[in-house]
Amino acid sequence: MEAEIWGRRIRAFRKLKGYTQEGFAKALGISVSILGEIERGNRLPSAAIIQDAADVLNISADELAPPEK
């Protein structure tokens, strides 16, 4: 469940900032297949990937994080 929430948020911010999966994966230094697994909720992103994604998207990791329930 948590992986799905992270995946949806990462995908939404990626699209909002105009990145393709290929371009975003390259900027993060990961494969497109790993990014796809994260965005589909099949893989929980590591803390390093979360921070790298926030940096590439020019947002804070807190903004990228799912809201507290």
Curated annotation (Swiss-Prot):
Signal sequence bounds: none
Top-level lineage group: Bacteria
Protein's name in the database: Uncharacterized HTH-type transcriptional regulator YazB
Residue ranges of DNA binding: 21-40
Ribosomal protein listed as a keyword: no
Single GO term (MF): DNA-binding transcription factor activity
Designated gene of the protein: yazB
Domain HTH cro/C1-type: 10-64
Record SUPFAM superfamilies: lambda repressor-like DNA-binding domains (SSF47413)
Keyword annotations from UniProtKB, A to Z: DNA-binding, Transcription, Transcription regulation
Keyword Transcription tagged: yes
Ranges that cross the membrane: none
InterPro entries in alphabetical order: Bact_TransReg_Diox (IPR050807), Cro/C1-type_HTH (IPR001387), Lambda_DNA-bd_dom_sf (IPR010982)
One of the GO BP terms on file: regulation of DNA-templated transcription
